[in-house]
Amino acid sequence: LPQSGWRTSGASATSGDIRNMYEIAPLLDDPIHNLKTIRDLYRWAVTELETSDLSFGHGSPSALEDASFLICRALKLPFENFDMFLDAALTHNELVRIVHLIDRRVHDKTPTAYLLKEAWLTEHRFYIDERALIPRSYIAELLEEDLAPWAADPEAVQSVLDLCTGSGCLAILAQGAFPNAKVTGSDISQAALEVAKINRRDYDMEETLELVQSDLFENLQGRRFDIIISNPPYVTTDAMERLPSEYRHEPALALAAGADGMDVVRRILAEAADHLTEEGFIVVEVGDGLEAVEAAFPGLPITWLSVSGGDDQVFLAQRADLAQYFKTQH
């Protein structure tokens, strides 16, 4: 019996009482047998996540949101109407499946997006698995505004390159922002591009969105684009060693970028002018890398763009400025 014990009032317990105690006690210890509704499951899940050493940096900022997202999407329910379903009863199979997912989230530190094979960026759903970085980029916010005011006429944009496309999420958003453009997504990882192909198919863009395996511009020689966007690797060597366990489920190739986090950005900017049209520009995300960017490219005219994460996450550089800067560097 549990340490707390069962107590009978008055006389000592009969053999029937003892038998019932042994039948019931395991049920009290097993959450499977005590969670009846989505509300019950949600309360238990939040406690499990909140009391575990977890990191929430892959779309859900807290245990509350992580639990609601996991439960809703595992049950194929719309999370914007979560409250409507809180008192709905769960089937045994539903309960077992979600408790198993919570167990993997807590003990394996697997990000919820990988557990569900699903991630959301702005209001768009994307397929995701461990072959590609979980979609998260402030560039998505800028694409929602069609990169205004920098792209003055979205319908006039003819070509866009998403460098380091990964799952293809930004390339797909770019295709929506610039309907007349030929959008190309490139990545060094063929495995990541297989994920991008799934998303391209899901968004019915197989005829319009081009995917190219390339180490940055290597397989794009001779091609120029009106706009280049990139969310490249920018995590420093020291930061890589300190990353929470959740991030270690992601491809290191999509994160690691040398001592100052600028190894890939240096290569991108050094060649970008050769792949931009005359009035073209590049938009690059660098996390908290403002100081690293300014140290790596002193004197380069760049504009830091305002996003929800601050004014030090994403920058823009014009082709003419890049060409002049790197010409003088040599």
Regions found by a protein language model. Give the residues of each.
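N-terminal auxiliary segments of SAM/dcSAM-dependent transferases
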Residues: 20-122
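A general structural signal for well-ordered alpha-helical segments in protein cores
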Residues: 42, 67-68, 98, 167, ...
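S-adenosylmethionine
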Residues: 144, 180-182, 186-330
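Alpha-helix termini
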Residues: 52-57, 146-154, 204, 276
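Acidic, Ala/Val/Gly-enriched low-complexity intrinsically disordered segments
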Residues: 11-13, 17
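SAM-dependent Rossmann-like transferase core, predominantly class I methyltransferases
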Residues: 85-92, 96-179, 189-195
